[in-house]
Design a protein with these regions (language model features):
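Residues lining hydrophobic/aromatic ligand-binding pockets adjacent to catalytic sites
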Residues: 1-297
């Protein structure tokens, strides 16, 4: 078995990429035109905006229409579903109306504060919004990126099991607290992910006391790696802008080492996703294009 490679970036609408002007022709004036052009160059993309607000089902239909049949969208989970602080204003109106009255007056919510029945309703609404992608076999994975303060715990693992019960398709899980991947815990974590059919997501990022190591492992037929860059000084700087944190252009030899690593896993999986999140200017585009050449896509 030879795996299919999916190589792309974690946004096609990044402001600094558009301003850079080196990838998109200047004649392209909107997101729709840029998506069509992007899909001529790559076979997958990650949607980051879904972390901040529910995607519109109409947009999902349009994404299907504007991309080739084999093109895959990967959707980043809405913030509330991954233990992040979520503005009440980010919720669709009908969901706000269904909240208990005392919660409707808050400015922000955490998932731990809402009734489980309401959380299930919110999850179903989110899944309904992206259902056109699933119906047309254009949904790669839904990414659940935990925040750095969520340590390995029984409660967090039970929550992932609950998500698995309620979501069809590929769920990618990215841990950002190193307790999940410590030498003591990683074996148990990988066994749990395999049992629940959850896709572990490897990350390449600066190696600091609080970050996670780049351990390559497949817990489902998908091998997923996200490249955050290695801008160590920016990650160490308190309050560094997001753009600065991801301002890192991988060297060819760094990408080549990754190619060799994932190629060894190719016989054991069906799909390999290599997603570049170093979204600053055209860095992610350049590195994704290089990786495409390296893996023969």
């Amino acid at each position: 078995m030879v795996a299919t490679y999916y190589v792309g970036t974690c946004s096609w609408t990044d402001r600094t990429l558009i301003e850079e002007g080196s990838f998109y022709p200047p004649s392209l004036k909107n997101s729709a035109e840029r998506l069509s052009f992007y899909a001529q160059n790559f076979n997958t993309v990650e949607v980051d905006s879904s972390f901040y607000a529910f995607p519109a089902e109409r947009n999902a239909h349009l994404w299907v229409e504007r991309t080739p049949t084999s093109f895959l969208f990967n959707i980043k989970s809405f913030s509330l579903f991954t233990f992040h602080k979520t503005p009440l204003s980010a919720l669709p109106y009908f969901l706000k109306e269904e909240l208990p009255e005392n919660l409707q007056k808050r400015s922000h919510l955490y998932s731990s504060q809402v009734p489980k029945q309401w959380l299930k309703m919110a999850l179903d609404a989110f899944l309904s919004a992206i259902s056109p992608l699933q119906e047309e076999d254009k949904l790669g994975y839904i990414l659940f990126q935990f925040p750095p303060w969520i340590e390995k715990s029984r409660e967090a693992m039970e929550y992932l099991s609950w998500m698995r019960e309620n979501i069809k398709g590929t769920i990618a899980v990215e841990f950002r607290h190193n307790s999940w991947l410590s030498e003591e815990n990683r074996g148990e974590v990988f066994r749990f992910l395999r049992k629940e059919k959850l896709s572990y997501t490897c990350v390449d990022e600066p190696q600091l006391p609080w970050t996670v190591p780049p351990i390559v492992e497949a817990t489902t037929p998908e091998l997923i790696t996200r490249f955050h860059g290695r801008n160590k000084s920016a990650w160490e700087k308190k309050g560094a802008p997001v753009e600065e944190k991801f301002a890192y252009l991988y060297k060819e030899e760094e990408l080549n080492r990754w190619k060799e690593t994932v190629n060894k896993k190719s016989p054991d999986v069906e799909r390999i996703f290599l997603m570049f999140n170093n979204c600053f200017r055209d860095y992610a585009i350049v590195n994704a294009q290089q990786m495409k050449l390296f893996v023969g896509e």
